[in-house]
Curated annotation (Swiss-Prot):
SUPFAM superfamilies: Second domain of FERM. Residues 30-376 form the FERM domain. Widely expressed, with high expression in heart and spleen. GO terms for biological process: negative regulation of canonical Wnt signaling pathway; positive regulation of tumor necrosis factor production; protein localization to plasma membrane. The modification Phosphothreonine is found at T419. The modification Phosphoserine is found at S24, S383, S387, S408, S439, S446. The keyword Membrane applies. Residues 1-22, 376-408 are annotated as: Disordered. One of its GO terms (cellular component) is centriolar satellite. This is FERM domain-containing protein 8.
Amino acid sequence: MDGTEGSAGQPGPAERSHRSSVSSVGARAADVLVYLADDTVVPLAVENLPSLSAHELHRAVREVLQLPDIALDVFALWLVSPLLEVQLKPKHQPYKLGRQWPELLLRFTSAPDDDVAMDEPFLQFRRNVFFPKRRELQIHDEEVLRLLYEEAKGNVLAARYPCDVEDCEALGALVCRVQLGPYQPGRPAACDLREKLDSFLPAHLCKRGQSLFAALRGRGARAGPGEQGLLNAYRQVQEVSSDGGCEAALGTHYRAYLLKCHELPFYGCAFFHGEVDKPAQGFLHRGGRKPVSVAISLEGVHVIDSREKHVLLGLRFQELSWDHTSPEEEEPILWLEFDGDSEGTPVNKLLKIYSKQAELMSSLIEYCIELSQAAEPAGPQDSATGSPSDPSSSLAPVQRPKLRRQGSVVSSRIQHLSTIDYVEDGKGIRRVKPKRTTSFFSRQLSLGQGSYTVVQPGDSLEQG
């Protein structure tokens, strides 16, 4: 499993995948099915499947879809099931990994034996975790943009990417534009929206959408705040005149959708399953645990509440130290250390994430940091490689403001976490943020001046 990146959830038996990526195997030839993010199937006839590498299958998919060379970097092959998701390295052999799937599930998930026996992975062609967002802004091929759009849309609708209502409305409006065309008051397509509202908004926002349809049909009914926001956003989607006609216009809307998703800190992340301790609610009442998703990208780590669909903690790599432990007969733990305060006193905080994927998460953090450091000197040069004559290049702003709404689902909620707070025993706290005076772990992002210094802490840790 060296170098693979994955994520896992714990669905019920009803959610089992019935897909398979090998439809038939002969003496030499095999029919392989590769799925796209929109559930489209790419059938491939290949020979010598057991020894075929992910790189060779990737090339075959690109040829069938007639994708440009940039797709080699943008997309990767994944082995996916409801229990585990693994991005494959080019050298990996998907067929052999598929045969080893039960062993991977036992090692990296807590799924019951019956679920492990029934689970079957399928091959999916989707975004490469290691592809930088800044390079994504330079893509102008419409089919590549469409594939990225479909994947991002699926993550938004499934609430894998938690979004504020305002962002759901803006993104849903762009989906309306792509699927229904330019907004026209009273057009017959409004009835299509009634039947396909979950194609535009996450499920938890669709429950209160009944008044939207009458408003779209012009019957005078007042839509609720969320529904009215979607309707207003649909009206305001800008149309861009282009010599390329309809296809060029769709490419503009795909790009606009991706640009909006880039504002979400967990766009393009790999997702992992874990649990964290809840804060104790009383002297004799233990808090228990809550399930979380851990989203890791080239930029940092986000811990997301799996049930409430909001961010609990968001850290850039410059803001954390980390390690993982796998004690015998105990659960593996990913440790995240970051600066905080306790009743106004600066402290170091330790967060424990219980997960059988702690090893995968730790390895991915380390590799993402290595890639970021290696790419940093080339940043300004890469940003200048876009074609200045391309009018769509002006749609990519150099820098976008971060979301800072009060109560935003992407804002950290550290108060909902149970952490261990500590300072160096026997010494006063002397530091100027963000520089750390004490570090429990030695694994950090080193950026030279201004990076954290490693000082051994005292022996005793104080429970926060």
